[in-house]
Amino acid sequence: LEDTLSKREYDISKQYLAHICEKISDSVVDRQYLKRVRALVDYELGEISAQAFIKQLQEAMEMTIPAYESYLWGDQRGRIYPYREQEILILMGMGIAYYDVGELDKDIIIYETIIRSLDAGYMDEKNAAELKLINLANLARPLGKLGRYEEALAKAEEGLNMAISRGYAHGLVELMMGVAGCRMRIAKNSVDTKRKQQELAESKKMMQQAYYIAAARKDKYNQKNIAENLNYHFGLEM
């Protein structure tokens, strides 16, 4: 199931879910996992709205942290909460939905909250590092959308550099495309012709590298997405 989720093969994920439902225990942790994954799959398949997705994730979070909202935008916001991995994945799902509906301030708060918790050392170092680099890339998206291009690039590059230094291949293509996207936005808004050309060249190079990595991994989703971007922005046929 996790492999199909990482490859965005959500129709196959749905089939796995049907089998898992028959075998899963009645523990809170298992029910929370099932609720999160089912909501994600239904949302990505277009079967529920972003608001319904958020509501289901909120219900999943409340299974283990009833007052979780107070740590995000309530009176406990300044306090670092020791989130478990499953709770972080639920928050990341909320981040996806808030970005999609344009609630970018909430999106940023969620990713910053996750990163602070991961930096606090509550989780084992390897898992925390892998989750952090993904959330750095996630944080770059709303920052870029709000025109905070340099901040977005810094976060995206921090995540990519972490992945490279640790030999973390799983999210490498997405991280590279995040950096390439930030450079594209900087180029588009730059009045410095030399920098504009430099950022475009770096973006093109990174997209091409990401394409070949996706192709080697038989990652058809990202391969198609990158090919479309290269064709649209640079007129390249891959």
Question: Over which residues does each language-model region extend?
Answer:
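C-terminal non-catalytic interaction modules
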Residues: K188-M238
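Amphipathic alpha-helical segments of tetratricopeptide repeats
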Residues: K14-I24, L57-E69, D75-R77, E112-D124, ...
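Aromatic-anchored, glycine/proline-accented short structural segments
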Residues: L91-A163
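Hydrophobic alpha-helical segments and helix pairs
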Residues: R36-V37, V41-Y81
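Tandem amphipathic alpha-helical repeat scaffolds
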Residues: E2-R8, Y33-E47, Q86-E103, L131-K145, ...
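TPR-repeat structural position
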Residues: Y10-D11, I48-A50, L104, Y149, ...
